[in-house]
Amino acid sequence: MANLGYWLLALFVTMWTDVGLCKKRPKPGGWNTGGSRYPGQGSPGGNRYPPQGGTWGQPHGGGWGQPHGGSWGQPHGGSWGQPHGGGWGQGGGTHNQWNKPSKPKTNLKHVAGAAAAGAVVGGLGGYMLGSAMSRPMIHFGNDWEDRYYRENMYRYPNQVYYRPVDQYSNQNNFVHDCVNITIKQHTVTTTTKGENFTETDVKMMERVVEQMCVTQYQKESQAYYDGRRSSSTVLFSSPPVILLISFLIFLIVG
């Protein structure tokens, strides 16, 4: 965030300085002034705009990071592993024709975020597995079900599957999805071990998992809110941003 503030300050100061110089610079051309009437032809300062039809940061018409019109990682228009457009082993220059493409680096920020929120479960489309919880003590309305629950609660889940809270519009949607995927995964896993669940088991699991999903939602919502508030505080309290705001106020008042 601090680096972003420095960049914003540098960009603003550069633009302000450039505007000031443009206002003070004498107009070229005219009789016996030694200047050209067409400032775009042969100007000694060169062209400040990107050459050869590319956009900013594209020196030869390619996309960002494409120096000669190829796609990402293709410096001369060839496919991956073809440095100069030829087939495999037909590239020219000093490139090593048998080099394998470098492995992509792991984004440590993403790994840290996933570890903080919960372990991402492979094969479940972005679901995460929450931390283990104590199974709640629930009363089902009659002594037989209460006793059955106490004797079998160890067979029910103590962790829930969920997606990030920012993918849901409200708590009900989060809890509904959380309960469904958790019971489904727990039932499939347990069934493969040779153990089946009765209707009573499913009924009790729904009550237990629902309470755990509500707890998980409250925990994730608080963490998400704290993260956004912390990011905003860091951005607006950084010295470059404060200096930039002070400078803008000075320009407006002055």
UniProtKB/Swiss-Prot annotation:
The keyword Transmembrane helix does not apply. Sequence repeats lie at residues 51-58, 59-66, 67-74, 75-82, 83-90. A lipid is attached at S230 (GPI-anchor amidated serine). Cu(2+) 3 binds at H76, G77, G78. InterPro entries: Prion (IPR000817), Prion/Doppel_b-ribbon_dom_sf (IPR036924), Prion/Doppel_prot_b-ribbon_dom (IPR022416), Prion_copper_b_octapeptide (IPR020949), Prion_N (IPR025860). Residues 23-231 are annotated as: Interaction with GRB2, ERI3 and SYN1. Cu(2+) 2 binds at H68, G69, G70. N-glycosylated. It is found in: Cell membrane; Golgi apparatus. Disulfide bonds join C178-C213. One of its GO terms (cellular component) is nuclear membrane. Residues 23-38 are annotated as: Interaction with ADGRG6. Residues 231-254 form a propeptide. The modification Hydroxyproline is found at P44. It comes from the Eukaryota. One of its GO terms (molecular function) is glycosaminoglycan binding. Highly expressed in the brain, lung, kidney and heart. Expressed at low levels in the liver and spleen. Its primary physiological function is unclear. May play a role in neuronal development and synaptic plasticity. May be required for neuronal myelin sheath maintenance. May promote myelin homeostasis through acting as an agonist for ADGRG6 receptor. May play a role in iron uptake and iron homeostasis. Soluble oligomers are toxic to cultured neuroblastoma cells and induce apoptosis (in vitro). Association with GPC1 (via its heparan sulfate chains) targets PRNP to lipid rafts. Also provides Cu(2+) or Zn(2+) for the ascorbate-mediated GPC1 deaminase degradation of its heparan sulfate side chains. This is Major prion protein. It comes from Mus musculus (Mouse). The gene is Prnp.
